[in-house]
């Protein structure tokens, strides 16, 4: 099954133990956790099967998620 990468932002109230639980629950469904973010926002990158995306939408501690993509801050020639 095809996997897609996402950036997941957690709610500010999520503590480190809860973040670990969320990540392990996703891994149990076939996800692969990438980077963990804790400076600008709480969250992580994840690669998961397309049929598991609904789990992100339904999770009460996930504030926002979006497909991982290359971003530029300036016009690229």
From Swiss-Prot:
The keyword Ribosomal protein is annotated on this UniProt entry: no
Keyword Protein transport carried by entry: no
Biological processes annotated in GO: protein catabolic process in the vacuole; vacuole fusion, non-autophagic
InterPro entries from the UniProt entry: PBI_I9, S8pro/Inhibitor_I9, S8pro/Inhibitor_I9_sf
GO molecular function, one term: endopeptidase inhibitor activity
Keyword tags: Cytoplasm, Nucleus
GO CC, any one term: nucleus
Inhibitor I9 domain location: 5-74
Tree of life domain: Eukaryota
Main location per the UniProt record: cytoplasm
Location in or out of the cell: Cytoplasm; Nucleus
Family as reported in the entry's similarity comment: Belongs to the protease inhibitor I9 family.
Protein name: Uncharacterized protein C338.12
